[in-house]
Each structure stands twice: as C-alpha cells, then as structure tokens.
Amino acid sequence: MSERGPAMPGQVSPDVLKHALTEHAAPERLVVARGLFTGPNAAVTDDLYARIASGRAHRERYALHLEKSATVDTNTYFGRFPASYFQRWTTVTEVQLKLAFEASGRARVLLRGSDSHGNARTIASTEVDGTGTVELSAQLNEFMDGGALWMECIAVGGPLKITDLEWTVAAPPSIRPAAIAICTFNRADDCANTLAAIAGDKGVLAGIDAIYVVDQGTDCVGTRPLFGEIAAQLGDKLVYLRQPNLGGSGGFTRGMCEVSSITEHANVILMDDDILCEPETVLRLNAFANLTPTPTIVGAQMLFLKNPRYLLAGAEEANLPRLKPGRWAPNSLHNSDMVKHKQKKRTDAQYNGWWSCLIPAEVIAAVGLPLPMFIKWDDVEYSLRAGAAGFPTVTLPNAGVWHAEFHWKDLDDWTHYFIVRNSLITAALHSDIDVSVTGTILTRVIAEAIFSMRYGLAHTMIRAVEDFLEGPSVLADGGGAAAASVRAERSEYAETTTHPGVETGELTSTLPPTRPAGFLPDKRRYYLVLAKRGVYQWLGRTIPGPVMIPAVDAHWWHVSLFDYAVVTDASQAGVRVLRRDKQKLKKLSRRLMKAMRQFRKQTPSLQAQYRAALPELSSRENWVRLFNGDPTG
C-alpha cells in the first residue's frame, strides 16, 4: 500500500509495528473502568460522572473531596459499572471496587447495585478512618436482565477524600494488542484535538500499541503544530498515512487492513476525527473486548455534542425492509437526558456506529473487510455480516463519546445518495427484499420530496436507486466519482443551496409570513393525502407564496400546500428557497416510475449478484487497489 505526500512524523517501520502489536502478559487484575469525577472539558456537566447527593463536595478528574456530612455517589452515566453486560457477554463472575481514601473522622464507603427495574440495594459496605484503601467485591450472578453497580461514600465525622477508584476483574491469560484507527478528511484541527485527548491520558495510552491516522484530505492534520507536538510525544506509536479520499469506509478500512495484516489477534478501535473524545471510553471498550469468550464488536454510545447530557440511543438496530437504520433496540433509552435517566434493563444491539467502535481482527479474518461504500451504512452492513458469522455486537453503556447530532443536519444533502444506495445494498445482502413493500416505501419517500418541491433531494434518491440497479460494479471505484457527480448534479437544483436568513427579503422581494404546520395526517389517510398533494402540485392548485416555514414544521405534507416556500435549513445556518416547477415535477415523476418498475423487476437477480460479489469487494486485494489510487482495477 503506497503513501503519498512528504515524509513527516508518523512514519513507522513494519518491524516496529509487528513488535508492538503482540500479545502482552496479563496483570493479576485487569482494570475495566476507572473512577472519573469530571468530564474532559467544561462543556460536559460533572453530573455525568459523580453525583453530590447531599452536603458540600468538590469534584476533580480523579479525586472527590467531601466536607463533613456530605454524600457522593457514582450512580451516573460514566460512574456506573454495567454489571448486566459483563454477566451476559463476558467470562467475568466477580468484580472488585478498589479506591484510596483520606478520612479526617469516620466515613462510610458502600458498593451499591440495582436490578432491571432500577431498585437500588447495598451489596457491601465498610467503615473507614484515617488513610488507606478499600476493596469491595460483588458477584456477577444477579444481573442477567439489567442492573449496574456504583460507589457511594459518606463523610460522617469529617472531611473525606477519595482517589484512585478502579473497577477490576480477574485478568484473562493474556492481553490482546490494541490499535486506534482515526479517519480524517479536512478536519485537521478536530483530528489533532482528538489525538491530543488520547495522548494526554497516560493510563489509556499504556494500553494502546499503535494509533493510525488515515488522512484523506487536502487540509492535512500533519501540517498542524499540535500534531507535531503529539507525534513527538507518541513516537513509534503514531502511524500517519495519506491516501485518496475513499470516505469513512475507506479511512477506517485502511486502519483495519493495516492492523489485521500484522496480527489476527488484535483489537482495532475505529474513531471519528470530529468527536469530543472521552479517553476513558477507549480503556473500557478495550478491557471489555479482552474478556468476551467470542470475538465481539464492542461499540461506544453516542452522546450529543451540542447537548452533552443527552444520549442518542442505548443500542440500535436496522429495519431493512423499510431501509431505516438507527431504530432503537428493545428497552433502549433514546434521546434521553442521562443526568435524569438510567439504563435499567440490558439492551442488545444489532450494530454500532463507528464514531467509536472496536472490531477484533478475528472478525476481519473471518468475514473480510468492510464494503467500499464511501459513507453511510458501512457500519450497519459490517455488524450484520459479522453477526451472521457468529460474532455479536455489544453497545457498552457508560462508554461514550460526543458526536454532532444528526438532527442538526438537513436531509436534503448529497450524502443522502449514499444513505439510499447503501441501504439497498445492505438489504440485498442481508435480507430477502420484498420488492412490493420496499418499492412502495421508496416510491412514497421520493414522491414526498417531489411534491414538497425538494427536487434536488428527489433527484439524489432516484439516482441512488438507479445506481443500485447497476449492480456490484457501482462499488468498484470506492465511491469518489459518485460523490463528485451527485454534488455537481445537485447544484442544478436551486433549492439545494442554503442562503443566509438575512437575505430572505432580497430572495423573495417581500417579507413572507410564517406558516407553522398543522396536524400530521391520519395513518389511514396517509396515501390519500400524498396523492392529493401530488395532484394539487401538478395542477397548480396550491396556496400562493412566499411563506416562511421553520425547520420543525417543514414536513412534506405541509410544504406541499404552497407553491413558494422559504424553509429553514435543519442546521439553522440559513434558509432554502423552494418553488414549484412543473417541468421538474413531471420529469422526476417519470424517472421515479421508471426506476421503480426496474427495481421490482431486477432486484431478485441483483440480490444474487451482490451476494456473489461480496467476497471480492471486501477482500484485501480490492482494498489495496483502492488505497493505491486505482479506481478501475
């Protein structure tokens, strides 16, 4: 695999990497989580780490300071030990809470636990005074359906300081080598900051043997002074690679390919470049993966970057017939304030997003590398493929990173091409597509876009269906050509451009009134309303505009009432101007009908083609070709 660009820090010889990525001698006890009491920066509330239940107390990253009569516990998002997940998925039968204390007077330390209903109980407790350490143990034999463990401390007779809190278990025979793979594209500062967060935690770094930074951009992270500082600190642990832009799929796959070519017994931790990283999450994922009897994909949860208290979902699954990822798994919390709520019941994932996700090299050896999908659905497809081969995916609670909220990104975007195309490919590979059900859903969502004057979005989705119908060859170049052409084609549709809100008057030559949405159509009348809106748009029997429509009200069934609407972009960065255009409506409607006829006719045979092509598309040889910049083979 070739590299391009000038030599710079992060160039490491294969022999050094081979020596580093070897199994390590196991300690007597393995640390599976550390006690942290504040977040990685001021934007993150400390209540996600430790809760001051009563009295006065002060929290530091690795220490708690309690005044007399104060009570503090770690019954929090990052403070809880996920007992149910360890009992279900690992060989661990007992966990030990260990901490150091300095008590000026009598104090009490408790090991507390909960069940699947959230009922709390005391597992063990001890009275302390002076200076020393505490060790409290719990058997993991009562947490199958849910429940967690946490520490509680009470400064009874005077001030109390707690430090060096660790959750430990009996170590496995050896510790697997571990590498992080960060994929980046023109987010140089974000990537450098993520790298700095990992490098700044010595405890985490001690358990990582290599960090691969795969740079696919033109604004390279290697040019940043911070990167140079980190590179000097990391030395031979840092591997910096340049390659053509193959999207997140190609960036992450490069890391997986590099590590698995050295050893088939390693943990590869994929990590986005633009997250707010909690380094402790790396330690927790890696420790958990060392304890599973079967190689297991172990993923972190996603917390919201703008609203750091909120969790996207406890665990996710995909609805393939409806082409929908991000469905909440049974019992899963979703869009939840994790200061107020706790995950009581264990919830099992079907897949995990690659914002931070550990993939064992044994899985790669067994099922191959990811598909060259560029972006979107690659993580879903890979876990489905691994699951079919007997390798589960676990989304680990109390291991999370902060990632930009998806609802702040407008649906009408070039990436929607890959969402639709890759969802169809995934469904073809891992389900028996009912062309009637899936075809009806596709027709509906594209018609909704056409009738609500989002012609560029409709074109984007139709193009995705058309390319799916081309068969496996659509994946041959890794997706770069499709990304470029879809962007160029979308530029022909005026409503795909976002304008500053202050220009609304200039755009419309007036000050349009705001028109909020009414009620959602009754499910029983949904298709009737859709047909009616389509007829009215076709005949021009729409309400004259312009009108202003907030993003929260920009539903197809509302926007399609008008012939001219200024709609707030979901990013809140500006507005889109939507205008009825009968010629575009007519052209796109005809393309849609043609594409769906072909979809119903060709999909059964296409499923066989995609399945037959999977081994070659996910092969090391195919990916090396793409890494080397050969789009045609």
Language-model features, listed with the residues they occupy:
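Terminal low-complexity segments of carbohydrate-biosynthetic enzymes
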Residues: 2-148, 153, 421-633
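Short beta-strand-to-loop acidic/aromatic patch adjacent to the donor-nucleotide binding site
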Residues: 263-276
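A recurrent flexible, glycine/aromatic-enriched loop bordering the glycosyltransferase active site
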Residues: 329-357
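Cell-envelope/extracellular polymer assembly enzymes that use nucleotide-activated donors
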Residues: 177-179, 210, 381
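Donor nucleotide-sugar recognition loop
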Residues: 354-356, 365-384, 390-396, 414-415
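Conserved donor NDP-sugar-binding/catalytic core segment of glycosyltransferases
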Residues: 276-326
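Active-site donor/metal-binding and catalytic loop motifs
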Residues: 163-170, 396-412
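Acidic donor-binding segment of Leloir-type glycosyltransferases
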Residues: 198-241
